[in-house]
Amino acid sequence: MYKRQIDSNLGFAALVPYDKSFKDANGQWQKIKMAQFQMMYKGFIQLAIRSGYYEKMNYAVVYEDELVSYNPITGEIEFVSDFSNCAQRNAGEQDKIVGYYAWFKLKTGFSQELYMTTADVDNHARKYSQAYRYDIEKKKSSSKWTTDFEAMALKTVIKLLLSKWGILSVDMQRAIQDDQKVYDEEGNGAYLDNRPDQDTEEDPFAIEGSAEEPEELDITE
């Protein structure tokens, strides 16, 4: 699929097994095995590094005592100048996480950063992940957004940053397109998640040809 292998053992990508439920011609419920390809945030970083376009990259969880100000209109963000007085990160105070940050600098000298508040990320997940909305409604834990919100939040901010402002190699373009595609036993791919709950705004990750409503999935990992 890619010119250079993406190793799932290193946390770059994963195939998540699903049981897809459907009614057969006799009206009986049946299940078929499917697998969803998921790029992890480390995978996007690896592909960016391999492209040779990027001089530096970084990403981070942001704690309340590290943030001075954030302007959602201009995108400008200011952190404290002295992190030695910031204790929340070292204490592992997860309830003090206020946002997620990613930054890159190209070899041309161009640099760009992106910050999303925790609320921004949560709203994004609710809007574009049917599985996450299902978990919230049914109080279940079938979505990666539910079981590992931090990893998915970092992935979202990195993916948005690269897709909006980065230089995308062929592999990076393919990874953005293939992310969250679900495959059946015959290798046919479709997008069963990552759809907005309403069509009022364009999905920045939308794929053409995914007009069907996503079906309910049972994760079997």
PLM segments and residue spans:
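Glycine- and charge-rich intrinsically disordered segments
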Residues: 172-221
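Accessible peptide chain termini
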Residues: 1-3, 172-173
